A protein has these predicted regions:
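Hydrophobic/aromatic-rich transmembrane helices and adjacent perimembrane loops
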Residues: 158-159, 165-168, 207, 216, ...
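Membrane-interface transmembrane helices that cradle and orient dolichyl/undecaprenyl
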Residues: 134-136, 140, 175-197, 207, ...
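Transmembrane-lumen/periplasm boundary regions of multi-pass, lipid-linked membrane glycan transferases
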Residues: 67, 81, 87, 219-337, ...
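Short helix- or helix-capping micro-motifs
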Residues: 39-42, 145-150, 157, 177, ...
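Short acidic/glycine- and proline-prone juxtamembrane loop motifs at membrane-interface regions
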Residues: 56-57, 81, 154, 160-167
Length: 557
């Protein structure tokens, strides 16, 4: 007697766990309208008050690179990162300048212009999350996942900084939209799937032109590999198509990031790879200092760093949905799309959790997978509740929808309350607002108060006063904007520069900028000096400004 086994064909098959039609599945118009609402509302959260916080030191590097491009053409400025995002930022800044020259009464701040491209691609990512999730798990789960992304305070906060991670995740998602469509075309139609393969390759080229993290491509390859041992599968690229694939990927990368051909770019990448571009010797995590070198591996920032982020930085109901679904990822009834999510988690953990250097912005590339998993958990919980509270078939369709609306509404409320300082959001597990800035102060504050600190000092300081901080280049930039180019901005971690401080000079102690190199000095100021100003982001203390008198100076020296 032979045992019959159903062939694994494509993840696009609806998983048995969610069999049946939901409230929106029968109406393409409603689905389209819902997506438009999610993108527009998500964009609103991401662009409103985009200049409410000052630039970070990292963002200033992007602004300077754009200025260098405009002054000298393509250069190796900020060459450790690819060019695509900076090109978009250059366009945004040029358009903002034209706007400001035309509409003098409503100028666009440099902070807004620089951050706008990442905010836009962040909002558009909701569509890509929907398309991937609908291919894997169905329309209802896809809408929940897209809504969770659109309104998640951490996703919004990460999309509101001018860093490459938002572009990286956008093109990674776009590549896998085409990858999964290619799988469906190969398995279920007689038409050629080649166009989807080439679009996938182009998207991956754009991804690498956004940030040098090519190993994310391994997620798609591992998922593809899962099906290659099955005689029934028609989803096979072959050597020739793979060669064309990588050729397209490489050409698109070169077109979108031609600065990679410059010798200076390779010099900058070499310095970055050797850890010589890391300007500080530590990272504060949960009130403890850790080394921040990638090569420290398990001796650096703890492995559980991103687990803590997941527990405290996502809306509570989204966390519960994620935890509820984790066991489901190992159930066959969830469908073969679960393998894509499992590979996503596995390869991301290997790449990001075991290195010694970590930043919360790296979480951007796994957050869609977390929210998709959460959406699965919410849908499962809704179906489970429906089966227990009603025998009515029609009513059973509405219970999961109502639960999803409750969860999404919770995310909306959290984001409304967190605005415009979304990175400071903590759920009740993390202690809420009272504990904001405790877990990841470097990434939560991200130099946001430096602009206000320099503005305060500019009104007080004598000519030629020194200003010590851990972001001297950023301080100098804002001093120039405040028309105080006479101020001498120095590093708090430079012992020789600190020795030159005199009575009437200033020290800025920003939360998140505590390192091994300045810990003793900051403790001395805290114990023996009184700040002349204390700045806040919303209600959360973010920085202190000290004007040195003879007593404070003697304690420092």
């Amino acid at each position: 007697m032979s045992v019959h086994a159903d062939a694994i064909i494509t993840a696009g098959l609806r998983p048995d766990l969610f069999a049946g039609r939901g409230v929106l599945a029968n109406s393409k118009a409603l689905v389209f309208a819902a997506l438009i609402v999610l993108v527009v509302a998500g964009l609103g959260f991401r662009v409103t008050g985009l200049s409410a916080e000052g630039l970070s030191e990292d963002e200033l590097n992007k602004l300077n690179a754009v200025a260098d491009y405009r002054a000298h053409g393509l250069t190796g400025a900020n060459g450790e990162h690819p060019m695509l995002m900076k090109a978009c930022q250059a366009v945004s800044i040029i358009l903002a300048e034209k706007w400001n020259n035309t509409f003098l009464s409503n100028p666009i701040a440099p902070e807004t212009a620089l951050r706008l491209p990442t905010a836009v691609v962040g909002a558009l990512s909701a569509i890509l999350i929907f398309l991937i999730t609908s291919e894997l798990f169905g329309v209802e789960v896809a809408l929940i996942a897209a809504a969770l992304w659109a309104f998640d305070p951490s996703a919004i906060g990460l999309n509101r900084i001018a860093k490459e991670d938002s572009f990286l995740v956008f093109f990674f998602l776009l590549a896998n939209v085409f990858w999964l469509r290619g799988q469906r075309a190969a398995e279920s139609t007689d038409s050629s799937p080649n166009k989807y393969y080439w679009l996938t390759a182009a998207s991956y080229g754009a991804m690498v032109a956004s940030k040098y993290v090519p190993h994310l491509f391994a997620i798609s390859i591992c998922y593809y590999w899962m099906f290659q041992g099955l005689p029934e599968t028609r989803w096979r690229l072959g050597k020739k198509r793979l060669l064309i694939f990588f050729t397209i990927m490489g050409l698109v990368f070169l077109v979108l990031s031609p600065t990679v051909l410059l010798p200076e770019t390779w010099r900058q990448m070499g310095l970055f790879a050797g850890g010589k571009r890391i300007s500080h010797d530590g990272y504060e995590f949960m009130n403890h200092l850790y080394t921040q070198r990638f090569s420290d591996w398990l001796n650096g920032i703890p492995v559980y760093f991103y687990l803590v982020f997941t527990a405290v930085k996502l809306p509570l109901l989204a966390v519960l949905g994620f935890v509820a679904c984790l066991p489901l990822l190992f159930r066959r009834k969830l469908g073969d799309g679960r393998y894509f999510i499992l590979f996503w988690f596995l390869l991301w953990v290997v790449a990001f959790c075991f290195s010694g250097g970590k930043f919360t912005r790296y979480y951007t590339t796994i957050l869609p997978a977390v929210l998709i998993t959460s959406a699965l958990g919410i849908q499962f919980a809704g179906r489970w509740l429906a089966n227990r509270i009603s025998d009515s078939v029609s009513l059973k369709h509405y219970v999961p929808a109502i639960l999803a609306v409750i969860v999404i509404a919770g995310s909306v409320i959290d984001s409304v309350n967190a605005a415009p300082h979304f990175r400071l959001f903590l759920n009740s597990i993390g202690g809420g607002t009272n504990w904001a800035g405790y877990y990841f102060p470097h990434d939560e504050f991200y130099d946001a108060s430096m602009r206000d600190a320099i503005a305060e000092i500019a009104t007080r300081a004598r000519t030629g006063a020194r200003v010590a901080s851990e972001s001297p280049s950023l301080a100098a930039y804002y001093a120039e904007r405040a028309k105080r180019t006479d101020l001498v901005c120095i590093s708090l971690s430079d012992p020789d520069a600190v020795k030159q401080l005199a009575v009437g000079d200033y020290v800025i102690v920003a939360r998140g900028r505590r390192y091994f190199s300045n810990d003793a000095l900051i403790s001395t100021l805290r114990d023996h000096a009184t700040p002349i100003a204390e700045l806040k982001l919303g209600v959360v203390p973010s920085a202190k400004i000290y004007e040195l008198d003879q007593s404070a100076l003697s304690n420092l020296h």
